[in-house]
Amino acid sequence: MAEDCVDHAITLGRLHDEPCPTRNLRIHGYLQDSSALCELDVYGSDAAEIRALAKNPKLAMQLHPALPYIAAEVVWAARNEMARTVEDILARRTRALFLNAAAASTMAEPVAKPLAAELGYDAAWVTAQVNDFQVLAQQYRVV
C-alpha cells in the first residue's frame, strides 16, 4: 500500500522513479515461514516470547472461552507495548472489546489482575479498572 502511494506521488509530481529500496526489508516481527500460523503468531517473531511467558500456568490461562487471548499477552503488552490499562489491553492490543463486548466485559478482571501485578498496582486499582471498563464495554454491547 505504501509503495502504491509513493508510485502515485511519483506519477503526479513527475518525479524520478527508482526501484523500491524497502521491498525486501524485514521489519520487526518478520517470520520466515508463516504458512502454519497459530493464534499467537499475529505477534510475528515476538510470539516466542509470549509462549515462553505462557510456560507459567497462570499466564497460559485463556481469558475467555469465546476469544483466543491468554494472560501472557497481557504481561507481554505491559512490558513491550506500554499497555497501562484494561482498556489498553482489551480495546487496543487484542481488540476484544470490538470483537465481542460481552466477552470482553467478563475479561476485565482476569486482565486487570496480571496487569496490576506487572505494573505494581493494588487491589483498589484492579477494582477501579474493572469498573471503568464495564462502563465502557456497556457502550459497545449490541442491544
Model feature map: region roles:
Residues 2-143:
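C-terminal accessory subdomains/tails of enzymes that are appended
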